[in-house]
Amino acid sequence: DSEFAELKIRGKIFQLPILKASIGEDVIDISRVSAEVNCFTYDPGFMSTASCKSTITYIDGDKGILRHRGYNIKDLAEKSDFLEVAYLLIYGELPSIEQYNNFTKQVAHHSLVNERLHYLFQTFCSSSHPMAIMLAAIGSLSAFYPDLLNFKEADYELTAIRMIAKIPTIAAMSYKYSIGQPFVYPDNSLDFTENFLHMMFATPCTKYKVNPIIKNALNKIFILHADHEQNASTSTVRIAGSSGANAFACISTGIASLWGPAHGGANEAVINMLKEIGSSENIPKYIAKAKDKSDPFRLMGFGHRVYKNYDPRASVLKETCKEVLKELGQLENNPLLQIAIELEAIALKDEYFIERKLYPNVDFYSGIIYKAMGIPSQMFTVLFAIARTVGWMAQWKEMHEDPGQKISRPR
């Protein structure tokens, strides 16, 4: 039986359908409110508004649950590789061995970018931020695939594969250009994560031997960042896509949104904060500063718009961080890790943080891992974009396959 919520306004009662969720909260359908009541709803930041139907990702922030297509994020991080999760997000099911092999071969086949793209890179000054370079490069792909500007249903999957394949190549090119080194071509004998590390750190005169611990850690980081419901950048991709814009342009808008310090740049802010704290002895002073509303200092890496419990991704990254630093001989003498662990322990026992449900989030440990790997801070958000492109493309594909989706037009 259908359920309804009642809205009473100006002496009249209107019935609003309640849509049943397969899991999580039900939703009140307000799509007819403006026509029937002559009023709009007001929800800054979309705090209580669902803009679409989706079966890709589920989050229960109160319980600290994150699932992709029904699979727990911790299980995926421990037992899958990134392209397996990419297949899951795009197609809805984990691949068979044959499907996985075919998918990875297609991604490898499309990893090379057009040589003319090199000329675009040369137009940037050497001090350009890698995100600025990547933003322009991804958007420029529209010019190289004019046949895909008007999409048919059969093109969605090929476009997703192309985007997933080319973004690590372009990301590594952005880094190489920013440090004045020659580009390194992808090596299709390597898997996705190995290939990215190869393109980042190899040079024409020096081969890069991939450390399996580093590869495994980066694989987990990519999985943990692959999708996260209708966040700012994903919503931006969907809004752009609702107009019929091509996928390359849509992903460019997602990258632009992700670049914002409140979204994708938080792990770099955590590193800067830990450096500012300087030593464990200073933690109480900075805890006090964080509580002081008149003090501009903020405790970065704590709290989340959705999670009111421990971010499940953060617990995986905490252990991954220890594994990486142990492998690199930094576990006992890495000052940033020591400060982070003690800061977390103190904050989790403090009533101020407990009452406000401020727990470590995914950004708290990821920057420490990147730094230990030798990845510079200006590349942190670039790596986030590599991972999140999988989610963006899955959401973009789902949006186009939804017959009820309309062009986005907030009032």
UniProtKB/Swiss-Prot annotation:
Citrate synthase is found in nearly all cells capable of oxidative metabolism. One of its GO terms (molecular function) is citrate (Si)-synthase activity. It comes from Rickettsia akari. Belongs to the citrate synthase family. Pathway: Carbohydrate metabolism; tricarboxylic acid cycle; isocitrate from oxaloacetate: step 1/2. This is Citrate synthase. It is an enzyme of class 2 (transferase). Disulfide bonds: none annotated. The keyword Transferase applies. Keywords: Transferase, Tricarboxylic acid cycle. GO terms for cellular component: cytoplasm. Pfam families: Citrate_synt (PF00285). One of its GO terms (biological process) is tricarboxylic acid cycle. The active site is at H304, D363. Transmembrane segments: none annotated.
